From Swiss-Prot:
GO terms for cellular component: cytoplasm. Its main location: cytoplasm. This is Molybdenum cofactor guanylyltransferase. It comes from Rhodobacter capsulatus (Rhodopseudomonas capsulata). It catalyses: Mo-molybdopterin + GTP + H(+) = Mo-molybdopterin guanine dinucleotide + diphosphate.
Amino acid sequence: MRIAGIILAGGQGRRMGREKALVPLSGVPLIARVLALAPQVEAVAISANGDPGRFGLGLPVLPDRPGESGLGPMAGIRAGLDWAAGIGAEALVSTATDTPFLPEDLVERLAAAAPAHAQSFGRDHYTAALWRVATVPRIDALFAADERRIARLSGGAVAVPFDTTPDPFANLNTPEDLARAEDRLRQNAP
């Protein structure tokens, strides 16, 4: 199965006080840390609105489709699925830009259970998921019904457990979360 990847970077970053994708963690922007996903997929794009040049990573930056701007991660996944289909991929793995500790076997394990989303310690992580390109009509139907909850989209998907400590899907929403992540990196430094 040909698999593409998308980094969901469309959030406003209100609690962080700035755009999370560009927040440095030990001197490296969060989005660059999440880009470690790249070797696991055939191609990677970024889902974000606004100036695509701000990322400076040389990757395609996919805005939400007209009429779907600001509708949350499902809009980014929808744009990513169009892009994935256009490059000949059969599936798309999505990840959030504020999850810098993703497992090195994320794509492999999600693909083995496809369609699937990650789960850690009983908590579902619907933005860390593998979506088949054939999911597009379901997303369109949910949008038509004014449904934006990504959990609804993943109905029927397998929850793949990643129960390692520390949590590989810990997301960074606040400056306090960022400080904890800095501590985590310091503790794991050689």
